């Protein structure tokens, strides 16, 4: 009984153990739980081990995949950061400023870092070299190269590399400094500083900053590591901003660009350019770079200024409009024609005889001045402004004029001689007509203008200067400076087409005059400008070039012109008569505002743009509309007598 009970109990326990442990579970409905006993138990164990091994393999694969994924994420992050993250690379500051040696001084002038190549030989001075260091430090003092001083700070300083002297022209004379000296002459007074004013390195002059400031409306400060001077010489409105938080100024606009310097919260910067996400700025200590726009605030306009008294150059302008006529006098005997040439004139205020010229390249002048001529003109109620030329005398080339003017002693010699001759003849003024000025001679010519102006005014002589119509190629005549130191600036609004032109054309079209006046008035006040007009024109003769001629000219400017031209200058009456003699008829040309005629003869074509009362009136209207100081005519004896009444209607 007990055995059966025990057996029954065992079976019963076996069923209980074989069940899943929840309602509805049976062998038929699910896999039974194995206990490890019997054949079926051993088979279940193997299956469990197999499952465990599979699970481990899956876990390993999953782990490896996670590791690979993490590596990929890290790699992608590194690539992303490399491409888009901020760089901590610092710029080489000495390279940024162009510093090569321990005594070099970097210059930041009006928010611009001046590089070595920017201060090299591209200027008009013959003392320039190809490798000018912008600034230097000598014996603890800071110096600026002359080329940089002239081009970027104060163009009135003048360096004579031949005679080793630095000049600065004041209204009453020159300030003069010799090299390696702490002494200088201000007009006639000797002064000194506690530093050497002028140092030289070959032909390169370096001028001490405090001495420059004495004659210049500028402020400067100096920073170290590296040595640099921050100079401001332009005043007026600027844009500033405040730094929101500590950040970097970078070389270019972008987070990968090298860092120039750090700026602190509340630092003030000058804003130069707005490039959306970045601002180009200048820091107070002289770095010009870029800051993220979001790090700036309180952006605003400010006016900056400095108390400084600019030198005032005295002027001897007349209290009436100028009606001046040049008188082309070629020898002493020609002075006797003054009565004849003035006989038919009316309304003239000034006569300008061509009396003085350069005799040689040593600073001597030739003169055919005549006191009797002056007395007659004065009796007729006119002033005499004697013309001083660099041609039709002993010299007649660009090189000869350059060779004369680039020496201070030669300039002083010719200035003294021409003023003395003018005073001796009793003239009222000097009219400077130097037309052979090359670009390299420009700075020397302008210095002549300054110096001669001072000496004229010291001798009660009106000083006027003749100029071509302003063009880019003659900008070295420096109309702006002329307008400051001279009494009158004369624009010769003729020779639009000359004897050497490759094609026929007007000597003085209306647009040529208008353009000349417009460009001049950008640099010189109207009450100092005199417009020169012609009493002559050119009769042109043109023939078609042969194939042989075109072949010979191949590769030259002349080759682009199909006709060969020649011309001769004619006075107003002679020009009009040439049209009549040819049986031609002149017609009004609206474009040039001149009467134009052409005719065929002598195997070619003649063309002429006439100067007559009609064309002159068109020019006089332009002069009047622009409220200029007056008019000048080239030249006496070539006009129609009727023009004087016309001119008087427009020039009172």
Predicted segment positions?
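N-terminal targeting leaders characterized by basic, low-complexity, disordered sequences
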Residues: 1-53
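Primary recognition of N-terminal secretory signal peptides and signal-anchoring hydrophobic helices
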Residues: 55-275, 304-317
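Glycan-recognition patch characteristic of GH18 chitinases/ENGases
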Residues: 303-417
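Glycan-binding loop/region signatures in secreted carbohydrate-active enzymes
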Residues: 306, 393-395, 400, 537-619, ...
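Short, acidic/polar
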Residues: 329-345, 408-423, 471-479, 611-624
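Conserved, mostly hydrophobic/aromatic
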Residues: 351, 432, 489, 531, ...
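Active-site groove signature of glycoside hydrolases
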Residues: 355, 413-444, 491-503, 632
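Substrate-binding surface in catalytic domains of secreted glycosidases
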Residues: 361-368, 416, 442-577
């Amino acid at each position: 009984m007990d055995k059966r009970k025990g057996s029954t109990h065992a079976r019963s326990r076996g069923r209980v153990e074989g069940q899943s442990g929840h309602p509805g579970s049976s062998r038929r409905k699910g896999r039974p739980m194995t206990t490890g006993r019997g054949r079926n138990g051993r088979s279940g164990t193997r299956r469990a081990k197999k499952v465990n091994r599979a699970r481990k393999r899956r876990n390993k694969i999953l782990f490896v995949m996670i590791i690979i994924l993490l590596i990929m994420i890290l790699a992608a992050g590194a690539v992303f950061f490399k491409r888009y993250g901020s760089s901590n690379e610092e710029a080489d500051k000495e390279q940024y400023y162009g510093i090569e040696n321990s005594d070099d001084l970097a210059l930041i002038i009006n928010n611009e870092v001046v590089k070595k190549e920017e201060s090299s030989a591209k200027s008009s001075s013959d003392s320039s070299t190809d490798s000018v260091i912008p600034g230097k430090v000598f014996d603890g003092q800071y110096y600026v190269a002359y080329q940089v001083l002239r081009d970027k700070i104060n163009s009135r300083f003048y360096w004579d590399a031949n005679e080793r002297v630095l000049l600065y022209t004041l209204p009453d004379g020159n300030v003069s400094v010799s090299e390696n000296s702490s002494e200088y002459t201000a007009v006639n007074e000797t002064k000194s500083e506690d530093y050497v004013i002028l140092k030289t390195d070959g032909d390169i002059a370096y001028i001490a900053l405090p001495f420059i400031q004495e004659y210049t409306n500028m402020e400067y400060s100096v920073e170290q590591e590296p040595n640099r001077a921050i100079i401001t010489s332009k005043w007026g409105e600027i844009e500033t901003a405040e730094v929101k938080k500590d950040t970097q100024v970078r070389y270019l606009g972008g987070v990968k660009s090298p860092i120039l310097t750090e700026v602190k919260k509340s630092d003030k910067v000058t804003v130069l350019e707005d490039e959306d996400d970045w601002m180009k700025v200048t820091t107070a200590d002289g770095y010009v770079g870029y800051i993220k726009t979001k790090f700036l605030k309180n952006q605003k306009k400010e006016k900056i200024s400095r108390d400084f008294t600019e030198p005032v150059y005295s002027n001897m302008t007349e209290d009436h409009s100028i009606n001046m006529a040049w008188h082309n006098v070629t020898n002493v005997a020609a002075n006797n024609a003054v009565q004849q040439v003035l006989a038919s004139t009316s309304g003239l205020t000034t006569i300008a005889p061509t009396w003085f010229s350069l005799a040689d390249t040593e600073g001597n002048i030739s003169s055919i001045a005549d006191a009797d001529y002056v007395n007659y003109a004065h009796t007729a109620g006119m002033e005499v402004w004697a013309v001083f030329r660099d041609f039709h005398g002993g010299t007649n080339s660009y090189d000869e004029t350059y060779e004369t003017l680039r020496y201070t002693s030669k300039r002083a010699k010719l200035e003294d001689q021409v003023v003395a001759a003018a005073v001796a003849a009793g003239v009222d003024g000097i009219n400077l007509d130097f037309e052979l000025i090359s670009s390299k001679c420009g700075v020397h010519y302008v210095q002549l203008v300054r110096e001669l102006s001072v000496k004229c005014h010291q001798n009660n002589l009106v000083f006027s200067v003749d100029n071509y119509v302003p063009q880019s190629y003659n900008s070295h005549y420096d109309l702006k400076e002329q307008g400051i130191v001279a009494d009158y600036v004369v624009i010769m609004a003729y020779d639009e087409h000359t004897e050497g032109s490759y094609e026929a054309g007007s000597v003085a079209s209306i647009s040529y005059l208008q353009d000349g006046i417009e460009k001049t008035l950008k640099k010189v006040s109207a009450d100092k400008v005199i417009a020169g007009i012609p009493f002559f024109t050119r009769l042109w003769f043109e023939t078609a070039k042969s194939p042989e001629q075109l072949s010979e000219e191949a590769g030259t400017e002349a080759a682009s012109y199909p006709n060969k031209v020649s011309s001769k200058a004619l006075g107003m009456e002679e020009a009009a008569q040439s049209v009549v003699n040819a049986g031609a008829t002149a017609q009004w040309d609206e474009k040039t505002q001149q009467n134009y005629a052409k005719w065929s003869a002598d195997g070619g074509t003649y063309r002429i743009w006439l100067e007559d009362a009609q064309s002159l009136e068109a020019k006089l209207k332009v002069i009047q509309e622009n409220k200029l100081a007056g008019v000048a005519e080239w030249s006496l004896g070539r006009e129609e007598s009727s023009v004087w009444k016309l001119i008087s209607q427009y020039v009172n």
